[in-house]
A protein has these predicted regions:
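Beta-propeller domains
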Residues: 57-81
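Secretory targeting and sorting signals
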Residues: 1-25
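Beta-propeller domain segments
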Residues: 52, 60-63, 94-96, 104, ...
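Extracellular low-complexity, O-glycosylation-prone Ser/Thr/Pro/Gly-rich "stalks"
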Residues: 362, 379-486
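Asp-box/WD-like beta-propeller blade repeats and closely related beta-sheet repeat scaffolds
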Residues: 122-154
């Protein structure tokens, strides 16, 4: 049976055929680079950053320890938390698999953990606070050692999301992905502000006869890492395939109840027609690639929303594969489509991505036990350009602006990303003719699928509505694909 977990002990896989993404391909004019910043980790499985102003990263190790890294002091020798006495590591895929600091970690010090329980191998969600470990929710998982899932993360709604695999073996022997009476093969949504947990009243299966109300999304095989885009609250999910396709799914914040298809489908292909429900609506993946041809197990990543590379990489979702360690870049387009490309290679055996409090990306790798910081470099030729920013109207606390970008060079621009910074706390609320994102004061406008090319001497125009306070100073400095415009 094909190894299906991202954390299995493997030597580096043999060279594979050239990457041919099954999703829409596009050039990103972008290369990923990494810098090793720490070593000595023991099979790291997850990365999370507390929102406490400390600049720290928490890193889970499979055996049950949570380590602390700081960019100034490095990797601390003593663990922050050690729950190894509670954690089963039998089988390659069991262990401490997920960590999530409370959104109020600075005041409550609560750290949420997902692991396999040593007494019976049940997948377990627990809270560690004040030195006490409290179990919140478990799901029986003793029959097979693989497909535990384990990712946990808080959404922008303040609720905790937990991904659980289908129960293991191969072919979904319990038909868990398509059943609503089990937590296997699902992503859950929980309110953990209660003593243990409560079910949010707006969960999609609340009140559905026979359904577990904790469920938020169904049809998953082994979700090995999901993450939220802080810009819009959407959820990116990487689901490890059976033997044909690895997939990445992208759900809007309002798509609770989505069925991602397993085990009726594997990626976009029918896996077992007898498990396809009549009248069911399955959500297609936004990216797939061939298992055993281009890799072995997808490793889900994160969307870049940092400031250091905002002008060239804002909105890019970065993922990889355990065996072949490519850097897959995927971007959501304004029209609902997605573009993808391979933009380099990452360190061998990547197991998890995470971001620091500033949105900068890190990754860990399995047996090498290293922490790496990710950076981006533009490969696009520096454009000659001018920008005209026009304030068309303003009222009370709002305004309407238009931006005209002109290519003053002698070569065409074949994909553009224009960046600027607001000085007075302005916020973009709605835009058109460009994909506009904002992180703090930094704004990035990227081309739509139909206006990516700007010929020499040509212009492209986009506009937006925004909110403001008393002052509304127009920006004067713009960068196009990393180069300054006049």
């Amino acid at each position: 049976m094909r190894r299906t977990a991202a954390i299995a002990a493997l030597s580096l896989c043999a060279a594979v055929a050239a990457f041919v993404p099954q999703a829409q391909a596009a050039e990103f004019d972008l290369v990923v680079e990494t810098t090793q910043v720490a070593s000595g980790l023991q099979r790291p499985t997850a990365i999370a950053a507390p929102d406490d102003g400390s600049g720290r990263l928490f890193i889970a190790e499979k055996a049950g320890r949570v380590r602390v890294y700081h960019p100034t002091t490095g990797l601390a020798a003593a663990p922050l938390v050690d729950v190894s006495a509670a954690v089963s590591t039998s089988g390659n895929e069991r262990g401490l698999l997920g960590i999530a600091p409370s959104p109020a970690y600075a005041t409550d010090g609560a750290l949420y953990l997902a692991y396999t329980r040593i007494s019976d191998n049940a997948v377990t969600l627990a809270r560690h606070k004040g030195g006490t470990l409290t179990e919140l929710l478990t799901q029986e998982h003793a029959t097979h050692a693989n497909h535990n899932g384990g990712q946990i993360a808080f959404g922008g709604d303040g609720h905790l999301y937990w991904g659980i695999g289908d129960g293991g073996s191969a072919g979904d022997p319990f038909n868990a992905g398509q059943r609503l009476d089990t937590l296997l093969g699902k992503i859950l949504r929980l309110d953990v502000s209660c003593a243990r947990y409560c079910v949010p009243a707006d969960n999609p299966f609340v009140g559905v006869t026979g359904a577990r109300p904790e469920i938020w999304a169904t049809g998953l095989r082994n979700p090995w890492r999901f993450s939220f885009d802080p810009a819009d609250g959407s959820l990116w999910i990487a689901d490890v395939g059976q033997g044909s396709l690895e997939e990445v799914d992208h759900l809007r914040a309002d798509q609770g109840g989505a069925d991602l298809g397993w085990s009726c489908r594997e990626g976009t292909e029918v896996f077992d027609a007898t498990r396809c429900r009549t009248g069911a609506s399955y959500v297609d993946p936004v990216f797939t690639y061939r298992t055993s041809v281009e890799g072995c197990a997808v490793i889900g990543g994160v969307v870049y929303r940092g400031s250091r590379f905002a002008d060239i990489a804002s909105g890019v979702y970065l993922a990889s594969d355990y065996c072949t360690n490519p850097a897959f870049a995927i971007r959501a387009n304004p029209d609902g489509t997605h573009t993808s490309a391979r933009i380099g290679e990452l360190p061998i055996q990547p197991t998890s991505f995470g971001t620091d409090a500033d949105g900068e990306i890190y990754l860990v790798n399995d047996l090498p036990g290293q922490l790496h910081k990710v950076s981006f470099r533009s490969t696009a030729p520096r454009a000659s350009c001018t920008v005209t920013y026009r304030l068309l109207s303003q009222w009370g606390n709002g305004f309407h602006a238009e931006v005209v970008l002109a290519n003053t060079g002698t070569s065409p621009v074949t994909g553009w990303s224009l960046a600027w910074t607001f000085a007075d706390g302005q916020r973009v609320t709605n835009g058109w003719n460009a994909a506009i994102t904002q992180q703090g004061a930094a704004v990035t406008a990227a081309n739509a699928s139909w206006n990516a090319a700007i010929a020499p001497g040509a212009t492209v125009t986009f506009g937006f509505l925004g909110s403001k306070t008393a002052t509304n100073t127009a920006p004067t400095a713009f960068t196009l694909n990393g180069g300054a415009c006049r």
